[in-house]
Structures are given as C-alpha cells and as structure tokens.
C-alpha cells in the first residue's frame, strides 16, 4: 500500500485531549479500512502564518499513514466535515521516517538564544535625565561591552 503523511491543524480553542480524539478518530477510520498509522506526532499549539477562519494559533498533528487511496479520500472527506479542523494536507511519500520530525527536534533547542550584537542603541536620554535632541552630537551610543579602546580615548579627550 502507498505511504502518506497528513498534517492537520485543529482550532486553538479545543484542548489537547480533544485533538487526540480527532487523531484517534482518523486512526480508527484508517485501520477499519485495512490501513495502518505508522507515525503520530503532536507538535503542540503553534502560531499560524496567517489567520485561518479567525484563528491565529492551532494545534498541529502529523500522521504517517499506510493506506489505500480510497481510504485516504474518505479520511480527507471526514476531516473536511469536522469543524474543529482548520486545515489539513496529505502528501504521498516514499517512506515514513521514524525519527522525530523537524518541529519536535527543534523543541529541545533554546528559543531565546543570544542573537549577538545588533548595532548601537538609539540615543534616548542623558544620564541627567534630559532628552537627547537633534542638536546633540552623540546620535548613537554603543553598549560598554562593545566599545573599542579608540572610542574610550575619544571620550576621555572630550
């Protein structure tokens, strides 16, 4: 039988247990028609790239399926009728990778990693509290840890 991967996005208002119920229904429907679910991953509640049916977030689920094309069309019909499913996409694949997919592999990485120096800070206020104006010479000031020795020498001369 051909192999398929199906990614479905469920509404953010439903709970994870309800998302599991949707995935269980798909699994039961595929297995009742002599198919098999080889892989099932819950990617979590994620931001959508754009609004879908007035939703900005959705629960993502990946299913790896081994089923006949008629079974897949019936599964897609059932997903289309379910009001809790915002979108789904099923593609045919050569093989189903047993390793965790990319979103799950990235989950272990630190999302708030240091992005490095991003340029000088725009001028805000002087230490005295007076706001910086257009007539002030110092438009930008670098953080102390990024200032070079040359900058420090110029500041000492002034």
Curated annotation (Swiss-Prot):
Disordered: annotated segments: 98-158
Keywords in alphabetical order, please. Ribonucleoprotein, Ribosomal protein, RNA-binding, rRNA-binding
For this record, the Gene Ontology CC terms, alphabetical, are: cytosolic small ribosomal subunit
Q: Which InterPro entries match?
A: Ribosomal_bS6, Ribosomal_bS6_CS, Ribosomal_bS6_sf, Ribosomal_S6_plastid/chlpt, Transl_elong_EF1B/ribsomal_bS6
State the superkingdom: Bacteria
Which stretches does UniProt call biased (Basic and acidic residues)? 106-117, 127-150
Q: Name one GO molecular function term.
A: small ribosomal subunit rRNA binding
Q: Name one GO biological process term.
A: translation
What this protein is reported to do is described as: Binds together with bS18 to 16S ribosomal RNA.
NCBIfam families linked = S6
The family assignment reads:
Belongs to the bacterial ribosomal protein bS6 family.
PANTHER family associated with the record: MITOCHONDRIAL 28S RIBOSOMAL PROTEIN S6, SMALL RIBOSOMAL SUBUNIT PROTEIN BS6M
Protein's name in the database:
Small ribosomal subunit protein bS6
